[in-house]
C-alpha cells in the first residue's frame, strides 16, 4: 500500500512509515515547494490544523505494482485526476453511523489523553465528506458493508481480483 503523510501527532501504537509518515508543517511546506504533493487535505481540528497528504516520493511505481490507498473521497478524486481513471478502482467501505461512532470512541478511550471533542468533530465532518452527493460526484457506486470483518474482506478481495 501507499503510506500517506500527516502533520498530526502520532497516536499511541502508531509507527512512523506504517500508518503514516509523520512530518511537521515545515516538511510539508518543503515538499509542496518541491512539487512532490499529489493531493492534500487540511482540517482545523480541536487540536490545531492537521494536514493529510499523498506525495510523489518514489514509493509509487504503477508500472510495476498495484497499490491500496486509504483516503477520503476528495483524495480519491485527486489521485484519479493525477494518475488517471484507468488505474483507480474505488473500494468504499461503509460502516453504519452508530457502529462507526462506537469504534471511534473505543479507539479514543485507549489513548492516554483521549481527545473526545476532536472525535466528535471528525465524526460530523466524515458524515459530510462521505455524503451521498459526494459519493455520486466521485462516481463511486460499489459499497462494502463493514459489519462482519471477514465477510467484508472476502468481498473486497473478490472485487480486487475482478479488476486486476
Q: What are the residue ranges of the model-derived segments?
A:
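ATP-dependent small-molecule kinase phosphotransfer cores
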Residues: 6-67, 71-73
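Conserved phosphate-donor/acceptor-positioning beta-strand/loop module used by diverse small-molecule
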Residues: 66-72, 83-107
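C-terminal accessory "lid"/substrate-recognition subdomains
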Residues: 63, 157-164
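Conserved catalytic network of the ASCE P-loop NTPase/AAA+ motor domain
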Residues: 12-13, 58-63, 81-86, 134-137
